[in-house]
Amino acid sequence: MRKVLGVLMLISAITVEAQVNGEDRLGSWHMYFGTNRISNKFSIHSEAQLRYYEQAKNFNQLLLRAGLNYHIDANAWTTFGYGYIVTDGSFEEFPEETNSIEHRIFERFFLKNKVWEFNFEHRYTLEQRFLDFRDRTDVQHRMRYRLQMTVPLTNTFFLNFYDEIFINLQEDIFGQNRLYAALGINVTENLNLQLGYLKNHFSEAHYDRLQVAVTYNPDLRGVLKKKK
């Protein structure tokens, strides 16, 4: 009987914790990504994301990112950029609650390769994170690796999968892991839409998120040449 009560108490505690931190809610991420080619070697990366604990409500995070890409060749490029992130770290709303602010410097290296009809992309990231929690500040460093696979179904439709691991370069080495699957639509040569599902794992919490992403990659080289 004691064992049964113990199990029931454990289940109850887990359920309450999931309700408090929002693990039991299906959240949503609304995202825009852009790469504007300005020369044979350089392009500009732009990005905006709105993340919610629930479906388009209960704000979690605003992420704005921009960077300069240097294209080594068609299958390799680097990025140096800056990110501005506003985060509400609590699922519940509290009186006089303040959001944290992060200024992030990041460096990335991309490699692409193809195996049969499968298109692979390897993304390596280093981040220098300057965090302001209002009552204290902190500087943290992080490393990320993402393996992405894109599978064309037709000229219009494709599947996209990735797994990304976050490694902290200080205490608590494991940061998080993201596992993603999506159906994509090529609207034009430079514009695509994706509707996906993300499993976001932390050491003490696991979240499920729907993702809606718009990617627009216009080539501005012709426009810039005309202006000259």
Task: Show which residues each predicted segment covers.
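Residues on the lipid-exposed face of transmembrane beta-strands in outer-membrane beta-barrel proteins
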Residues: 32-36, 66-70, 107-111, 145-151, ...
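Residues that define the transmembrane beta-barrel architecture of outer-membrane proteins
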Residues: 26-28, 60-62, 101-105, 139-143, ...
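Repeated loop/turn-to-beta-strand initiation elements of outer-membrane beta-barrel proteins
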Residues: 41-46, 75-80, 116-120, 155-159, ...
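Start-of-domain marker
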Residues: 19-79
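Predominantly the C-terminal beta-signal and adjacent terminal strand-loop region
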Residues: 161, 173-228
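Transmembrane beta-strands of outer-membrane beta-barrel pores
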Residues: 48-54, 82-88, 113-115, 126-130, ...
